[in-house]
Amino acid sequence: MVRHHLAATAIAACAAPSLLAYNVSPSATFLNQALAFVLWGWFVIACAGLSTPRVAWRQRAEWPVLVALALLCAAALAPWWFGVLPSSLALSVLGTLVATVVLLVAGAQAARGEWGTVLFALFCLGWLCAGVLNAGISIVQVFAPEWPDGDWIAHSGIPGRAVGNLRQPNHLSSLLLWYCVAVAGLLELKRLRRVAAWVLMALMVFAVVLSASRTGLVSVLLLALWGLIDKRLSRATRLLLLASPLMYLLAWLGMSAWAELGAHRFGGAARLAETDVSGSRFGIWANTLALIRQQPLMGVGFGEFNYAWSLTPFPGRPIAFFDHAHNLPLQLAAEIGLPLATLVMALFLYALWRPAKAALHLAGDSGLALRCSLLMVVMIGLHSLLEYPLWYAYFLLPTAWAWGYALGACASSGVLSSSASTASSETTTSATAPRLMAAGAALVMGGALAVVDYTRVSVIFSSAEGAAPLVQRIAAGQRSVLFSHHADYAAATLDEGDAEPAVGASLPTPPPTPPPPLAPFKGAAHYLLDTRLMMAWAKALAANGREDQASHLAARLKEFRNEQSDALFAACAKAPSPAAYPCHAPQRVYNWREFMP
């Protein structure tokens, strides 16, 4: 009965967040992430009552990651303390980092107990179910694109490519590669038949091809490398892993032939035709290195990458509005400075090296579980060199659990032979379970309360019948604990025509229009600067007598070459050129810190 409950919670935690297609503006992934908090918290609660040996904190193998996370918490606290980072953004970051600590400790605790291998097998079962269902969604998105309704199955915004219900092909491929590791692990643990493993592996590789993700291709090659070098795997498992690149090639050729013969769309062909193989990453990496050179010691501040990058002159910048460097080490170096980023990355690398070293010696099912969990972390780490999957709770939390498991497993033999393991299961359970249960319950409650708080801003972006006037909805949203920056965005970009006048009200001669307030930009600009917000901010700066700063902002906006900003520069085409702020260069180049409201 206990095992069935654990299996149900593992499947729900792994699969449900990636299957939820329904979303509510302004965030397309918030509900998925909130669901991840709730379900992974429930998984922690379910595992907390299992007997595990008591381990002193100084003996815990997960300490390098805990120290790194503590440093990141301090880095997030500092700009909030000094009034730079809005409280809603700081609290969101801190809550996520604390949740990461909970899953890390829970994973390590699971690996130390007698249920360790069983729990990892159930973890793999969860990703197996998630992968099969997401593969089915991928097939529908490519072969029957008219079927998705947006609520149960998401529409693919990229013709001929699968994006899953997470709506991102790279996220889909990362999830599917975890599913592949789970298939190999379950086969090796003799919990999956060979024929079933081959069918499931072929399905996974086919779905990765449908996503046309380059990250997915690299990960498939990594699977083959695992099969090549890990000689402790059975012959059947090694053949399965070594065959994955061949499966990929055959699936790609088959899809290409299908597209040519039937005049269908295969997104992989478009990917091959792209001239910029980096997808603008080389450009954003070059800009990030420039930011690092400008602020090498302290960085631009935690969470301030988009703010600093958008306001710094980069004439050849990528035209997309990047809120991340698409490379974890570069992101950390740019935001928290080279010294602290180097320390954090060194701790992370040490926390990878330690289980990797132990994997060379630990045999049996425990050794296999260690290698599989470590490979899952390595795969998402490689993805983090090209994207930012760990900024999403549905990847971050299971990564923390798997990493904790790998660290706990690498030290389990030493722990179990120590005097600490002589404590009885009953004593150990009573000492450990309440704290983990409380932490898991906090995640469940936190995820649920976050949804309630989110409704305070989601109503701003809906037009339900009987809703309060827009200005009132914005004011209510600005009182949100975690999402007030979304309400600030609405307030900052609110056009005069968006206000809803009272029916039948008299219309006296209006007084002179006051300049737009700058306060809403303090929250909105630190979340994401886009075309609409930059235009509104430039207009507000000019109206408040800061025309030269408005010219600087307009010059930065022009670098993005976005059609939505053409209206701002339309008057500049007239002869002679007007003296308005969008039409002339600023008298000097401003540092991005000078725009702090």
Language model: regions and residue ranges:
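Alpha-helical transmembrane segments of multi-pass inner-membrane proteins
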Residues: A8-L20, A36-A48, C73-W80, V93-A106, ...
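Short aromatic-rich membrane-water interface segments that cap or initiate transmembrane helices
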Residues: S25-P26, V84-G95, G157-L172, A273-F282, ...
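Flexible juxtamembrane loops connecting transmembrane helices in multi-pass membrane enzymes
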Residues: R161-A162, L223, A251-N287, A369, ...
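Transmembrane signal-anchor hairpin modules in multi-pass inner-membrane enzymes, especially those
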Residues: M1-A78, V84-S92, V98-A121, L125, ...
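Transmembrane alpha-helices of multi-pass inner-membrane enzymes
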Residues: F37-V44, V181, A224, L362-A423, ...
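TM-adjacent membrane-interface loops and short helices in multi-pass inner/ER membrane proteins
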Residues: Q168, F282-F322, P329, I336-T342
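Membrane-interface catalytic loops of GT-C/OST-like multi-pass glycosylation enzymes that act
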Residues: A28-L31, S87-L91, L166-N170, A212-T215, ...
